[in-house]
């Protein structure tokens, strides 16, 4: 059973991610946050398995969308898949010095999307009042930014 401390940390991390999503959505009218069905529909549109629906948070279009508008892609419309990584740490030179976790599904979706001509990128967001902002890094450029990388397994026992 998870400790109350780990539960508190999870809630805090979820709040930080929500704040980062809100910051991004308010700062860029080209961003849209699809619901679960919308994410699956986007993947279906690309011919990618729906199991990757949680491996991205937002879609960036070439046109502005309103927050309450249901996302409907126009025929041949280009878009990008965006995965948010957020922190409250002071990072004045984003994305430099950013520490984050990423799942195998995020990397696999990035690979498949890239093969289909769709950009997949991470949006590194700092919520610190003195360094609030964001930086996009395309998954194909990520290795150029990585200083160190390690594998961590998340295991569920039966």
Feature map (PLM): residue ranges:
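Residues that flank catalytic or metal-binding motifs in active/ligand-binding sites
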Residues: 54, 78-80, 118
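Acidic-basic catalytic patches of nuclease active cores, encompassing PD-(D/E)XK
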Residues: 1-54
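Conserved catalytic cores of phosphodiester-cleaving nucleases, focusing on short active-site segments
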Residues: 24, 58-60, 78-88
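Domain-level recognition of nuclease-like catalytic cores that cleave nucleotide substrates
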Residues: 111-158
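Structural motif
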Residues: 79, 97-99, 120
């Amino acid at each position: 059973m998870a400790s109350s401390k780990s539960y508190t940390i999870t809630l805090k991390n979820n709040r930080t991610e929500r704040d980062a999503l809100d910051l991004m959505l308010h700062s860029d009218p080209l961003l849209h946050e699809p619901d679960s069905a919308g994410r699956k529909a986007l993947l279906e549109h690309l011919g990618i398995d729906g199991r990757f629906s949680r491996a991205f948070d937002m879609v960036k279009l070439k046109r502005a969308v309103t927050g309450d508008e249901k996302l409907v892609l126009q025929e041949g419309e280009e878009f990008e898949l965006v995965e948010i990584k957020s922190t409250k740490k002071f990072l004045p030179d984003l994305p430099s010095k950013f520490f984050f976790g990423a799942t195998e599904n995020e990397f696999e979706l990035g690979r498949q999307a890239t093969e289909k001509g769709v950009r997949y990128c991470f949006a590194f967001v700092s919520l610190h009042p003195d360094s609030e902002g964001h930086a996009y890094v395309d998954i194909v450029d990520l290795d150029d930014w990585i200083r160190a990388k390690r594998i961590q397994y998340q295991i569920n026992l039966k």
